[in-house]
């Protein structure tokens, strides 16, 4: 009886503490400028401290292609080159938050 109560207490506490839950993210190695996955898109589940990410590449000011998925290391940033901009976005607030 005491073991059952202890187990129940652990379950309740873990839900109250907001322990990380797996998050579903869009996954595609190449998304075209129209937002269509060209490489057979799917979804992935984050594990541990992973986040969903979205990388978009702009060439001469026009969206060219992108990449989306789950990543252990995701730092939101924009990298600039005279003709290319690479934009990284990270999210972990809702399922499928990395929509292209």
Swiss-Prot record:
Family matches, as InterPro entries: LY6_UPA_recep-like
Keywords: Disulfide bond, Glycoprotein, Secreted, Signal
Residues of the UPAR/Ly6 domain: 23-100
Main location: secreted
GO cellular component: extracellular space
Entry comment on modification after translation: Glycosylated.
Sugar attachment sites: 60
Cysteine disulfide partners in this protein: 25-52, 28-37, 44-70, 74-90, 91-97
UniProt tissue specificity: Expressed in placenta, where it is detected in both fetal tissues (cotyledon and intercotyledon) and maternal tissues (caruncle and intercaruncular endometrium) (at protein level). Expressed in the mesenchyme area of villi in the cotyledon (at protein level). In endometrium, expressed in the luminal epithelium and weakly in the subluminal stroma (at protein level). Detected in trophoblast mononucleate cells (TMCs) (at protein level). Also detected in trophoblast binucleate cells (BNCs). Overall, expression is strongest in fetal tissue and lower in maternal tissue.
Localisation: Secreted
Taxonomy, superkingdom: Eukaryota
UniProt-listed Pfam families: UPAR_LY6
GO molecular function: collagen binding
Signal peptide: 1-22
Keyword Signal belongs to the record: yes
Stated role: Binds specifically to type I collagen.
Protein name as it appears in the record: Secreted protein of Ly-6 domain 1
Native species: Bos taurus
């Amino acid at each position: 009886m005491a073991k059952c109560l202890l187990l129940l207490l652990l379950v309740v506490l873990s839900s109250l503490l907001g322990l990380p839950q797996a998050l579903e993210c869009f996954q595609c190695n190449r998304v075209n400028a129209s937002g269509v996955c060209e490489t057979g898109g799917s979804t992935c589940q984050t594990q541990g401290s992973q986040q969903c990410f979205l990388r978009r590449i702009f060439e001469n000011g026009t969206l060219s292609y992108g990449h989306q998925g789950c990543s252990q290391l995701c730092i939101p940033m924009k990298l600039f080159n005279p003709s290319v901009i690479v934009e990284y976005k990270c999210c972990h607030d809702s399922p499928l938050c990395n929509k292209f």
